[in-house]
């Protein structure tokens, strides 16, 4: 989100080593769960809160009130850290978001109590803090790029965001849906912009999948 471009995470910013270190210590004697695109990932299992360690695929975070996509990410990642706070301190649970698999995903559910015990034993709280700080920075920068921007600027930002996904995940995602779910722009407006960009050889989309992206124009 610097200079009007989308904030694209790199390995250093995302603290991949922190995430992988947590995965390494926590994923032991746990069976993975695999779900297909469009399915909900439940952090509440058997009426017990869980942390979800995502090892494969892409996830989107949706606002419960209107299903607008608030954020997204690709593996490896960890879900449920914020919701775990309410569980740990017995606060009223009223999560404003829910998680949807954007592609086929694999994850390991870990009860919050067990996760906290492992975090204490293996001294993982610094890693957890780094992950949460990254998320705050990511969302702040992403909002700056989308809120109050014109339609083309929003579409450009999200095309760049989608392009930053691993190819295997990107090929499972419909570009038009990806943009509409995150902006609320009309389908016709999105398709108009995408059509113009394709005509100018800025992008290549086949069956809804973003295959190529070149330097996008500053304005439209």
Indicate residue ranges for each PLM-predicted region.
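Cyclic-nucleotide recognition modules
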Residues: 72-131
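Polybasic "coupling" helices that flank or enter modular domains
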Residues: 123-184
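Short beta-strand segments in beta-sandwich/barrel cores
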Residues: 31, 40, 57-63, 106-107
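Phosphate-/nucleic-acid-contacting segments
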Residues: 160-220
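Cyclic nucleotide-binding regulatory module and flanking cytosolic helices
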Residues: 1-41, 78, 83-90
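Structural motif
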Residues: 50, 58, 104-106, 209
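Glycine- and acidic-residue-biased ligand/ion/polar-headgroup-sensing regions
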Residues: 49-67, 74-77
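A short beta-loop-beta micro-motif enriched in histidine and acidic residues
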Residues: 28-29, 38-51, 66, 93-95
